[in-house]
A protein has these predicted regions:
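Acyl-donor (CoA/ACP) binding surface of acyl/acetyltransferases
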Residues: 1-23, 29-154
Length: 154
C-alpha cells in the first residue's frame, strides 16, 4: 500500500507527490512514488525523483531511486537533497538499504549517490535480456545506501 507523505521539504527544495503507482506483478515492478522537485516557495518544477518500494531482481539494475534535474538547475545538489528527503518515505516502508544505480560515465549522478554516504558495490554489466539493455544501457554503477547512517549535507 502506498500511504507515504504527499509533501516533503528541507527549506531549500520541496517534493510534491505527483503519482503513486501500485505494483505491476506481470512486469515484476514494485509500487512506485513519483515526486516533483520544486525550489521552496516556487511553483517551478526543477526535476523529479522516483522511489520504488521493494526488493527484486529489477532493482539490481534500475535501483530503488531514480532522479532527474532540469539542466538549468544542475550543480546545486538538488538531487542529493531530494534523495535525503525521499529517504523518509523509504523509512516509512522499512526499506533499508536502498539500491541506487547510475550510468558509470555520469559523474554528477555518482556524486549524488556518494555525498549522502552510499557505498559503491561495483560497476555491473546490464544483462542482454533486461529492458535497460534494449534502451542502450550496457553498464550500471550499483550503490547501497543506508539513509539512517547518512552524513549531514555539506
Amino acid at each position: 500500500m502506498l500511504d507515504g507523505p504527499t509533501h516533503l521539504s528541507d527549506g531549500v527544495v520541496c517534493l510534491t507527490l505527483e503519482q503513486a503507482r501500485p505494483a505491476e506483478p506481470d512486469r515484476d515492478w514494485p509500487p512506485e512514488y513519483r515526486y516533483g522537485i520544486f525550489l521552496e516557495g516556487s511553483s517551478v518544477r526543477v526535476g523529479e525523483i522516483r522511489l520504488r518500494v521493494g526488493r527484486n531482481k529489477e532493482m539490481l539494475q534500475g535501483g530503488n531511486l531514480g532522479y532527474e534535474i532540469a539542466e538549468s538547475h544542475r550543480g546545486h545538489h538538488l538531487a542529493e537533497r531530494a534523495c535525503r528527503l525521499v529517504a523518509e518515505v523509504a523509512r516509512h516502508h522499512r526499506l533499508d538499504p536502498l539500491i541506487v544505480t547510475c550510468d558509470p560515465a555520469n559523474i554528477a549522478s555518482r556524486r549524488t549517490c556518494e555525498r549522502p554516504g552510499a557505498t559503491l558495490l561495483g560497476v555491473f554489466d546490464v544483462p542482454p535480456e533486461h529492458r535497460m539493455y534494449s534502451e542502450g544501457w550496457r553498464q550500471r554503477c550499483r550503490y547501497e545506501w543506508h539513509p539512517g547512517r547518512s552524513p549531514s549535507p555539506s
